[in-house]
Amino acid sequence: MPTINQLIRKGRLGLTHKKKVPALGESNPQRRGVCTKVYTTTPRKPNSALRKVARVKISGYGEVTAYIPGEGHNLQEHSVVLIRGGRVKDLPGVRYHIIRGALDLRGVQNRKKARSKYGVKKSG
């Protein structure tokens, strides 16, 4: 227990909060990485599916697990992708999303609605 004098001299340390997306660093909204493994995994209870995810190597950080949104994808090992923050609630440890339509990952085929989220250009 500190004395009043010690508190006056040094004060109390503030709480430091843990970053939700440490791989993006302080000021990067997105980072580029290389896929090391592309696979499917099952979500937590009570959901049931085969969710598509990829292990992505980010230079200067390490490997993270990122979710591949949308129906169908063309990712394989050594594909270069752009990741953003954003967790997947029913997949433990998945704290990043891969951006569709950027670098090696194509946009979703035949997508008509919410196109900008899935990297699809306006057709017609």
Swiss-Prot record:
Molecular function, one GO term: rRNA binding
What InterPro entries would the database entry show?
NA-bd_OB-fold, Ribosomal_uS12, Ribosomal_uS12_bac
Where are the membrane-spanning stretches? none
Per its database record, what is this protein's job?
With S4 and S5 plays an important role in translational accuracy.
Quaternary structure, from the entry:
Part of the 30S ribosomal subunit. Contacts proteins S8 and S17. May interact with IF1 in the 30S initiation complex.
Keywords, ordered alphabetically: Methylation, Ribonucleoprotein, Ribosomal protein, RNA-binding, rRNA-binding, tRNA-binding
Which species is this UniProt entry from?
Wolbachia pipientis wMel
Picking any one GO biological process from the record gives: translation
Query: Which superkingdom heads the taxonomic lineage of this protein's source?
Result: Bacteria
**GO CC, alphabetical:** small ribosomal subunit
Annotated protein name in UniProt: Small ribosomal subunit protein uS12
- The answer to keyword RNA-binding applying to this record is yes
